[in-house]
């Protein structure tokens, strides 16, 4: 189903064209920026057949938009495949989760999954459907608030429910006549190369990334699968300590332990944090929000750690044990204070 370009979308593409004219053709890093690629992707998906003078012009426009989105001169075959998979993955997410993930600007499918896994951990319901009670809705509303959009319905699932095509099934097709004139003027301003030239250019660039080997198809597929699996296990390595990670986002967080970088800063008091989840927990100190409730006595807590420590009062659990005398404690701080007794005795 095709949809006509909205006025806001046309404005975004016009901005891109103006920037290209201003900066010239040698600014490849700017052209490969995630923001610009996302705008081209949106226009590639939303281009309506009625907006083009004819079938060849429509195909040419699609080739140009697709090339600007996937940037074969900047990306390998694997990276282009990842961009396509990332787009489809985002499209099958519920709208609330889709907006949440897009706000973090993931560049790969793995980064998108990491954003969702972080959200699962913060909601303390990993791998399960988030309950629709008011308490959970308030928590998620706080997380979605920075997006600056109204979210009236927050029945969120962390697993796929309906694809975008299923959600749009049965809806009448929109008429693109209103935007046809604007789009014709927009694309006629540029001299678009012929579609055959696009095809040859992209094929040449893609084939250049993968050398040909005189091996059988089965051997190549098996070797490629084995190398891919090994790369996926530990493909991101820290240059400082040699520790490896499966996801680039985990490596980025780890590097901050070496650099001391704390990019997440509290607007209220200025305190900085290494991870975004730590800042979210800290914000509750200022807002007074206590989303964690003890089922035994009903006491509320601002953080999950405080609730866990409190619940040990009811269960009698004392997981922290002194190595010197074997005495157990409910919280680690009590164990640390106790260990000073042994340290003082040794000194005297």
UniProtKB/Swiss-Prot annotation:
GO terms for cellular component: nucleus. It is found in: Nucleus. Residues 163-184 have a biased composition (Basic and acidic residues). Keywords: DNA-binding, Metal-binding, Nucleus, Repeat, Transcription, Transcription regulation, Zinc, Zinc-finger. Changing residue 137 to Q: In a colorectal cancer sample; somatic mutation. Residues 41-123 form the SCAN box domain. It comes from the Eukaryota. Pfam families: SCAN, zf-C2H2. Residues 160-184, 205-226 are annotated as: Disordered. A zinc finger (C2H2-type) spans 236-258, 264-286, 292-314, 320-342. GO terms for biological process: regulation of transcription by RNA polymerase II. GO terms for molecular function: DNA-binding transcription factor activity, RNA polymerase II-specific; RNA polymerase II cis-regulatory region sequence-specific DNA binding; sequence-specific double-stranded DNA binding; zinc ion binding. Gene3D superfamilies: Classic Zinc Finger (3.30.160.60), DNA breaking-rejoining enzymes (1.10.4020.10). The keyword Lipoprotein does not apply. Its main location: nucleus. SMART domains: SCAN (SM00431), ZnF_C2H2 (SM00355). May be involved in transcriptional regulation. PANTHER family: ZINC FINGER AND SCAN DOMAIN-CONTAINING (PTHR23226), ZINC FINGER AND SCAN DOMAIN-CONTAINING PROTEIN 16 (PTHR23226:SF52). Belongs to the krueppel C2H2-type zinc-finger protein family. This is Zinc finger and SCAN domain-containing protein 16.
